[in-house]
Amino acid sequence: MAHKKGQGSTRNGRDSHSKRLGIKEFSGEVVKAGHILLRQRGTKFKPGKNVGMGRDFTLYSLVHGQVEWDGSRRLVHVKPFNTA
């Protein structure tokens, strides 16, 4: 008989890396074209005016302007600055 217990294996020790989802630019913030506004899984929020949606449902700005969130309809808009 063994005097010491053999080393068993554990069933723990695994975890996935966080995906860094969520809102990146809030209402009133100034963004340039191409800035990421939101990372999400699925279409929890939908793109509004001057906002594009990537293949992984990421919302990004299409123009230089100010971010506007429409909370009631879950839309994100970017209000462009007037260029004279």
Curated annotation (Swiss-Prot):
**Residue spans of biased composition, Basic and acidic residues class:** 12-21
Show the Gene3D superfamilies listed in the entry.
2.40.50.100
Keywords from UniProt, A to Z, are: Ribonucleoprotein, Ribosomal protein
Sample GO molecular function, one term: structural constituent of ribosome
Among InterPro entries, the record links this protein to: Ribosomal_bL27, Ribosomal_bL27_CS
One of the GO biological process terms: translation
- Which SUPFAM superfamilies does this entry report, sorted A to Z? Ribosomal L27 protein-like
Region listing for Disordered, in residue ranges? 1-21
This protein's GO CC annotations: ribonucleoprotein complex; ribosome
Q: Does the keyword Transmembrane apply?
A: no
| Assigned protein family | Belongs to the bacterial ribosomal protein bL27 family.
Record's protein name:
Large ribosomal subunit protein bL27
Source organism: Methylacidiphilum infernorum (isolate V4)
Question: Taxonomic classification, please?
Answer: Bacteria, Pseudomonadati, Verrucomicrobiota, Methylacidiphilae, Methylacidiphilales
